[in-house]
């Protein structure tokens, strides 16, 4: 605004600003009474017109047609006026324009020169309107009369019908006259009427419920129950279990939920059931059940089926004496012979797994005399044992490592890692061994392993022995692998009677060893002794013997035959001594 050169416009703007921002109205009364700039402007214009008429010059003579350019005209004399005008009044070219006085305030014809009301006037008007409304409102105080309740409303006397059942009273003896057998409480009567509550045998699996856990990973599974009737079988049972729960524990929890939701459905033990893969429409697939020892988080199935385990297919083995196991059967006669042997074996197998007797009876599964009958409980145990053996046989070829101690010929122990698979066994010294020098690892094919047994059992420890074929030309681990010459003395097997060294662990090369080298004309055997806990020893023994029984090599049969002959000779010697 300060850069604007028209002083008359600046003064007009200041005047209009005072008028528009004054809330009291006093400035408007004083400054709007007489608009002095406009009055001075009209007076200045009228005086300027009269003066210009008086100073109009006379006509020049005709002789001088061309004006003299060198002639100077004097300036007009100063006109004296009787008023003081705003400076810069004659510099404004648009005095008639209404917007020249102020660019902020625009006066429109339809609005007029009315000024907006101040905030004070608006507040006063609102207060006036509120007072008028309050004058039309009438306030009335309402007091509710509350009657206090009477005591009889709270303590009403109930009428109990005096109905006593007519029970024939028994005559009591003189000793029972003071007894209170005739008085029974309502709790006693309710307990007598209610059925006997039996303890749920699956209650221990309730701790795997994932709905009551906070901050732990859970897994939701829809389980179809195959033991339910047809209408209820089509709808899955929704369960939420912990992610760390194993399949065996999930089966127990599903049985627990089933016993609560369907109490009339009889349930068997956990060994009878398995979780099978299924589709969303309850179509159970032809796959084996999930492994009971695996966690449920390992499998990503959202729908499973709980059903009884399928019966194991009977395995028939036909041995051909004098023939190699890998012989290719290209002859039609050999094929016919094998087919006839398989048919005869299938005919001799009954439904309960026992072999049929030629006379018509079943061995181990039919009816017998005296104590030979098999109860249903024994059949269930036998079936569960077969299931466990089946699982062990399926998992036996898988590689697994065990950490245990090997005993060398100097009675020293060193930590080793024993790896067992369906192809070989590996013995590797533990890398963090501090005192003993590092020894070379041993890798032996499973075809050279003959037998595995637990020699000694202590409180929490066990002595495990693995027999394998000896190779005198190469010995990778001399501390645990001993070799005896052919003419060496062969010790006998300790059976626990008549031997002072029974139950004592011996070094492989010590003379008191329980079982030395077996030998034939061409085969010699050696063994490794391991010291570990009882549970690990049982796992290794079961796993390795399952592998050896499935392969049934010629080396193992030779070992067992030699061992049986030595035991027979030992018993004959004992009888001769007696």
Curated annotation (Swiss-Prot):
UniProt keywords, alphabetically: Apoptosis
The CRIM domain, residue ranges: 184-309
Record Pfam families: CRIM, SIN1, SIN1_PH
Chain positions covered by the region annotation Disordered: 47-76, 354-379
InterPro entries: CRIM_dom, PH-like_dom_sf, Sin1/Avo1, Sin1_N, Sin1_PH_dom
Domain of life: Eukaryota
Subunit structure: Component of the target of rapamycin complex 2 (TORC2).
PANTHER family attached to this UniProt entry: TARGET OF RAPAMYCIN COMPLEX 2 SUBUNIT MAPKAP1 (PTHR13335:SF1)
Function, as annotated: Component of the target of rapamycin complex 2 (TORC2), which transduces signals from growth factors to pathways involved in proliferation, cytoskeletal organization and anabolic output. In response to growth factors, TORC2 phosphorylates and activates AGC protein kinase family members, such as Akt1. Within the TORC2 complex, Sin1 acts as a substrate adapter which recognizes and binds AGC protein kinase family members for phosphorylation by mTor.
This protein's name: Stress-activated map kinase-interacting protein 1
Source organism (scientific name): Drosophila pseudoobscura pseudoobscura (Fruit fly)
Taxonomy of the source species: Eukaryota, Metazoa, Ecdysozoa, Arthropoda, Hexapoda
Gene that produces this protein: Sin1
């Amino acid at each position: 605004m300060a850069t604007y050169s028209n002083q008359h416009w600046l003064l007009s703007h200041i005047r209009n600003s005072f008028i528009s921002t004054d809330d009291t109205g006093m400035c408007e009364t004083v400054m709007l009474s007489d608009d002095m700039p406009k009055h001075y402007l009209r007076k200045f214009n009228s005086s300027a017109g009269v003066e210009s008429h008086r100073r109009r010059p006379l006509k020049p003579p005709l002789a001088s047609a061309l004006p003299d350019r060198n002639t100077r005209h004097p300036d007009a004399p100063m006109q004296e006026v009787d008023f003081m005008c705003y400076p810069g009044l004659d510099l404004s070219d648009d005095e008639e324009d209404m917007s020249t006085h102020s660019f902020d305030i625009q006066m429109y014809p339809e609005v007029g020169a009315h000024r907006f009301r101040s905030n004070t006037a608006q507040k006063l008007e609102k207060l006036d309107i509120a007072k008028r409304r309050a004058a039309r409102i009438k306030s009335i105080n309402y007091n509710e009369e509350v009657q206090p309740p009477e005591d009889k409303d709270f303590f009403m006397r109930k009428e109990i019908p005096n109905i006593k059942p007519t029970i024939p009273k028994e005559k009591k003896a003189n000793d029972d006259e003071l007894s209170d057998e005739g008085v029974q409480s309502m709790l006693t009567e309710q307990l007598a009427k209610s059925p006997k509550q039996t303890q749920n045998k699956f209650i221990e699996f309730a701790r795997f419920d994932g709905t009551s856990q906070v901050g732990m990973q859970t897994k939701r599974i829809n389980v179809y129950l195959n033991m339910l009737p047809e209408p209820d079988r089509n709808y899955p049972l929704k369960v939420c279990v912990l992610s760390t729960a194993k399949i065996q524990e999930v089966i127990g929890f599903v049985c627990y939920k089933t016993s609560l939701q369907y109490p009339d459905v009889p349930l068997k033990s956990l060994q009878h059931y398995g979780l099978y893969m299924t589709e969303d429409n309850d179509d159970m697939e032809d796959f084996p059940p999930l492994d009971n020892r695996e966690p449920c988080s390992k499998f990503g199935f959202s729908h499973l089926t709980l059903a009884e385990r399928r019966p194991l297919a009977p395995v028939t083995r036909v041995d051909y004496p004098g023939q190699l196991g890998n012989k290719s059967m290209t002859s039609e006669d050999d094929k016919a012979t094998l087919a006839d042997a398989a048919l005869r074996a299938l005919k001799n197998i009954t439904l309960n797994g026992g072999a049929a007797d030629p006379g018509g009876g079943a061995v181990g599964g039919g009816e017998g005399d005296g104590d030979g009958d098999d109860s249903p409980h024994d059949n269930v145990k036998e079936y569960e044992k077969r299931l466990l053996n089946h699982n062990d046989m399926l998992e036996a070829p898988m590689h697994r490592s065990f950490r245990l101690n090997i005993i060398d010929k100097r009675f020293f122990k060193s930590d080793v890692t024993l790896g067992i698979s369906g192809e070989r066994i590996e013995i590797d010294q533990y890398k963090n061994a501090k005192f003993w020098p590092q020894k070379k690892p041993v890798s032996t094919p499973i075809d050279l392993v003959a037998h595995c047994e637990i020699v000694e059992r202590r409180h929490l420890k066990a002595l495990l022995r693995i027999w394998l074929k000896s190779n005198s030309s190469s010995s990778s681990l001399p501390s645990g692998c001993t070799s005896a010459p052919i003419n060496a003395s062969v010790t006998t097997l300790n059976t626990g009677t008549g031997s002072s060294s029974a139950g004592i662990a011996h070094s492989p090369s010590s003379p008191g060893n329980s079982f030395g080298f077996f030998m034939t004309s061409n085969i010699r055997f050696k063994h490794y002794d391991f010291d570990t806990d009882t549970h690990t020893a049982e796992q290794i023994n079961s796993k390795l013997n399952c592998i050896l029984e499935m392969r049934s090599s010629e080396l193992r049969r030779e070992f067992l035959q030699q061992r049986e002959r030595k035991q027979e000779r030992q018993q004959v010697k004992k009888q001769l001594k007696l």
